[in-house]
């Protein structure tokens, strides 16, 4: 017997906090379309991130900067239609919240109203405090993001591990506390030393989600296409691949082409 959609217990920000409190790890993956989101949700992932990484993964851009608010809303809407259980968090894209809390609020409201998302995610520390406060005051949950921040790639100049030096590490800890005090329900820590993420996780009450941040965080996130081995050109140290779908897809497509060329598809059982 199938479970009615209304009977499925949905993941909420409060449940993520409860998971941290009892020591249960949080699973988080990316999705940008209905089909992938449906698979991830049915598999039981706790959080689905509609990331601005869609700029790289779906559109082939070198950075996350080109993706627009309208495009993020399109991807988020597609994901939301597939979801029965998971919490869906959507990245506010570059240019939609930096430097102006009123603009940040308008962007967050558009995402929530037009896509049906459950929360938004923002990169930055003290510099986005006013925007975070403004968005949360409107009843919109916010997840923070510190460490390597892809929207600031031209500031950093490279995608190397962040906060190795004491000064930057201390700033990250301070920023994490500011985001928590501002009301963020969770925090992504990207590509920082494992010892630092452990310190941050122990000092915060809210859940931390790591990507390239070691094991001592409250949960982990990966880009689903990387986990599935769809893009075999990307091999960061932190990535564990669980499949080689690039090879699987290539083999399937090659077989299809061969069958078409050789007139083996369709056969009589595949005709009306």
Curated annotation (Swiss-Prot):
Single GO biological process annotation from the record: pantothenate biosynthetic process
Where is the protein found, in the record's own terms? Answer: Cytoplasm
Q: What is its EC number?
A: 2.1.2.11
Domain of life the protein comes from? Bacteria
Cystine links in this protein are none
Record keyword Membrane present: no
The entry's function note states: Catalyzes the reversible reaction in which hydroxymethyl group from 5,10-methylenetetrahydrofolate is transferred onto alpha-ketoisovalerate to form ketopantoate.
Q: Any idea what this protein is called?
A: 3-methyl-2-oxobutanoate hydroxymethyltransferase
Q: Which organism is it from?
A: Cytophaga hutchinsonii (strain ATCC 33406 / DSM 1761 / CIP 103989 / NBRC 15051 / NCIMB 9469 / D465)
List the top taxonomic levels of the source.
Answer: Bacteria, Pseudomonadati, Bacteroidota, Cytophagia, Cytophagales
């Amino acid at each position: 017997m199938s479970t009615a959609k209304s009977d499925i217990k949905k993941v909420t920000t409060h449940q993520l906090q409860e998971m941290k409190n009892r020591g249960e790890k949080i699973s988080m993956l990316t999705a940008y379309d209905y089909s992938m989101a449906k698979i991830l949700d049915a598999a039981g992932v706790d959080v689905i991130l509609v990331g601005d990484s869609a700029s790289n993964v779906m559109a082939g851009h070198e950075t996350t900067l080109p993706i627009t608010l309208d495009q993020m809303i399109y991807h988020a809407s597609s994901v939301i239609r597939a979801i029965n259980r998971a919490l869906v968090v959507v990245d506010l894209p570059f240019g939609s919240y930096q430097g102006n809390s009123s603009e940040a609020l308008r962007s967050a409201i558009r995402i929530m109203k037009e896509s049906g998302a459950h929360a938004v995610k923002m990169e930055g520390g003290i510099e986005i405090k006013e925007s975070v406060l403004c968005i949360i005051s409107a009843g919109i949950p916010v997840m923070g993001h510190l460490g390597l921040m892809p929207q600031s790639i031209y500031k950093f100049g490279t995608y190397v591990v962040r906060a190795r030096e004491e000064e930057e590490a201390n700033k990250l800890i301070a920023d994490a506390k500011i985001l928590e005090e501002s009301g963020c329900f969770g925090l992504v820590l990207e590509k920082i030393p494992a010892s630092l993420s452990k310190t941050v996780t122990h000092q915060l009450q809210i859940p931390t989600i790591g990507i390239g941040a070691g094991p001592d965080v409250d949960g982990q996130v990966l880009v689903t296409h990387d986990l599935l081995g769809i893009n075999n050109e990307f091999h960061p140290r932190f990535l564990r691949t669980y499949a080689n779908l690039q090879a699987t897809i290539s083999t399937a497509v090659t077989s299809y082409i061969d069958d078409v060329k050789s007139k083996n598809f369709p056969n009589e059982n595949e005709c009306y």
